[in-house]
Amino acid sequence: MTVNTQLNYQVYNWEGQVSGNADLNLKVSQDSGMYLVHRALVKQSNEKRQGSANTKTRSEVRGGGRKPWRQKGTGRARAGSIRSPLWRGGGVIFGPKPRSFTKKMNKKERQLALRTALNNKSVNTLIVENFNSYFHQPKTKLFMEAIHRWNLDLNKKVLVIVDKKDPNVYLSIRNLHNVELISADTLNIMALLAAHKIIITVDALSKIQEVYNG
């Protein structure tokens, strides 16, 4: 079951002062929201897995076609191949094989999980005016000063969501190991949940409303 929620934010300018207000209307899950968020997180985590682990069975290991000794009369245990899983250098029983760990999740469910996560993070979300025009060249110090004006702690993870990635902004933020920059159309559940604070530009907020509120 989904319910409509309206999130009201104060908008901060580059100097750290309140310059206006912004609203975000979201359809979020009321009952099973965290279950959907968990499924979306598992899906994204699984898609990062390479899935290339591979072992050889006794039929794939080189050699072992000849019976190592006769069946009876040697006093030793009977053996049919030196590549038996019981032998050193033999095949592996039920070992891993290359596989895909991808889990299926409907687009509507994924979007609902994202909206629910955004709603849950609303207390730790800061809306700011677009700041691309301040970066005429890459300058990390410029962004750090803005972070301090917005009263954010760089010792904790900060997620910055912009309308589209500006090369100068991206290069300025890249040096900060606790800050991640993503565009609104590549919003993902893992980045949202990992962030302690979320910064969203005004244009990115409009794009989130447009793209994910289906």
UniProtKB/Swiss-Prot annotation:
GO biological process terms on file: translation
Main localization of the protein described in the UniProt heading: plastid
Disulfide bond annotation, renumbered to this chain: none
Comp. bias (Basic residues): 64-75
InterPro entries listed in its UniProt record: Ribosomal_uL4, Ribosomal_uL4-like, Ribosomal_uL4_dom_sf
Region (Disordered): 42-81
Subcellular location: Plastid, Chloroplast
Pfam short name (any one): Ribosomal_L4
Subunit text: Part of the 50S ribosomal subunit.
Stated role: Probably binds the 23S rRNA.
Protein known as: Large ribosomal subunit protein uL4c
Gene that specifies this protein: rpl4
